């Protein structure tokens, strides 16, 4: 759809229903779900799905983009409600929870990883920027180190998310996240 033309209210509702139905199917781990099933679940015709998304891959990309949008909007709200180091802690745990929920989604995303889609690079950049914003706020408040970038922290989180294949990984991921946060805290050396 052209970005310059806003959607009518009914078209917006249909698009949102399609994204919601696709997200749920993908999160349920149904990587092979057919667009017909998604359209039926959304209460629209298959033609409506294809008017909004030219291909199944375009639908997958948009679901993922919306997930990233939701994640990357969280830091501003967290900083409004908490001190920067606590906001960072909560955001790190939110990312771990997202990885847990996104386990089924990762199977679906594999289908677009081989394409030249910029969706993953954009997502990485946006998440690194969100982490960088939290780190900068913590550094300005004197509670977090200033020598770690959002990109570096995102790479560390990537390692944590690779634990998903193991039993009880979430508890271990939360412990490692705590260690990361402890390492990021700005510590004033004791006076001699």
Region locations from a protein language model:
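Basic, helix-initiating cap at the start of DNA-binding domains
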Residues: 1-41, 58-61
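Amphipathic alpha-helical segments that line or abut small-molecule/effector binding pockets
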Residues: 20, 69, 85-100, 129, ...
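Short hydrophobic/aromatic patch on the recognition helix
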Residues: 43-53
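Alpha-helical DNA-contacting segments of helix-turn-helix folds
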Residues: 53, 60-67
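Hydrophobic alpha-helical connector segments
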Residues: 62, 73-101, 116-119
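Amphipathic alpha-helical packing segments from all-alpha helical-bundle domains
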Residues: 69, 115-161, 165-167, 171
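Short linear capping/connector segments at secondary-structure termini
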Residues: 107-117
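Conserved NTP phosphate-binding and transfer environment spanning the P-loop NTPase/kinase superfamily
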Residues: 163-168, 174-190
């Amino acid at each position: 759809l052209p970005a310059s033309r806003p959607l009518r209210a009914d078209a917006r509702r249909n698009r949102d229903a399609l994204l919601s139905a696709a997200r749920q199917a993908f999160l349920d781990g149904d990587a092979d779900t057919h667009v017909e099933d998604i359209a039926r679940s959304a209460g629209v015709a298959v033609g409506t799905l294809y008017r909004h998304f030219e291909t199944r891959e375009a639908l997958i990309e948009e679901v993922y983009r919306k997930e990233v949008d939701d994640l990357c909007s969280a830091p501003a709200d967290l900083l409004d409600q908490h001190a920067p180091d606590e906001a960072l802690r909560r955001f790190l745990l939110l990312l771990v929870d997202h990885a847990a929920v996104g386990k089924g989604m990762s199977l679906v995303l594999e289908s677009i990883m081989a394409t030249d889609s910029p969706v993953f690079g954009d997502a990485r950049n946006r998440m690194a920027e969100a982490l960088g914003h939290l780190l900068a706020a913590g550094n300005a408040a004197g509670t977090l180190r200033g020598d770690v970038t959002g990109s570096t922290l995102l790479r560390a989180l990537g390692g944590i998310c690779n634990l998903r294949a193991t039993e009880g990984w979430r508890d271990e991921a939360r412990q490692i996240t705590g260690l990361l946060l402890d390492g990021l805290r700005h510590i004033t050396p004791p006076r001699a």
